[in-house]
Amino acid sequence: MDVSGLTSIEQTALLTEYCRATDSRAVHPILGDHRAAATVAQIDYDFTTLAATPSVVPLVALRAKMLDERIRGFIAEHPDAVVVDLGAGFNSAVLRIDPPSGVDWYSVDLPAVIATRQALLPTHDHPVPASLLEPGWTDAIPADRPTMVFADGLVAFLDESDVIAILRRVTGHFASGVIAFNDYGPVSRLNRLVGRVATARKTNSPHDQWNFAGFKDARRPESWNPDLALLEEASVMQRPEAALFPGGLRLAGRLSHRVPAIARKARILQYRF
């Protein structure tokens, strides 16, 4: 399938899907999403232009696994839940989790991405072709049921003001639930510059689109939105699967138990509303 018409920001969805596909081909996969490999095989694209380094691949796979676990847990408690995937891209989480019939799953992304997603993935979710930066994306989603909102790989590409606006849109529309997303801790301008330099030979590096400066204190979003309450801060680096990371990243995983700044560099945050 030709995806050359996708914009640079829309093409960031290709990186995460390619990382999940690459993980599925590993001797000891972390996520093991073979649907991702099948999706990538259908796409006419030079994936070597992406910054899918040996360190990025397991981090993407493990954060997806951790989000899946939290979504499954929410559905187990609320079999009538609404699940909302923000910036869904080509993520096949709905297929990995296979929710019961009482659950309604909504995948939100830009119209061109949703059109491509529908052509590639045999899912039964509800597509929402809309920009998260526009107020109307929640209009077609039920507001009166327990809701699990999650975002995998989205927040880094937004300005802080956009993140705040999206969080307010979530708590203003849905009656109750949880929002979960992956986070990288504070990311300075120097960090972002180093990332761009390190991937300079890649024509489609996510560092070129990185906007969010992040935050150290996981309670920071509570100051943006009084309806949010921190539920969980879980480091990706401290999971047992970190033993499968490549050498340097594996060492960082061990150090993360002693150095909080390292633990914050890859984490899953959950907030109740």
Kindly label every feature range from the protein language model.
Residues 1-84, 88-128, 140-144:
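Rossmann-like AdoMet
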Residues 130-136:
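Conserved SAM/SAH-binding loop
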Residues 148, 172-187:
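Conserved beta-strand signature within the Rossmann-like core of class I S-adenosyl-L-methionine
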Residues 157-174:
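A short, conserved alpha-helix within the catalytic core of class I
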Residues 192-208:
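Short, glycine-/aromatic-enriched active-site segment of Class I SAM-dependent methyltransferases
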Residues 208-235:
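Short alpha-helix
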Residues 225-253:
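Conserved catalytic loop of SAM-dependent methyltransferase domains
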Residues 245-273:
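Core SAM-dependent methyltransferase catalytic element
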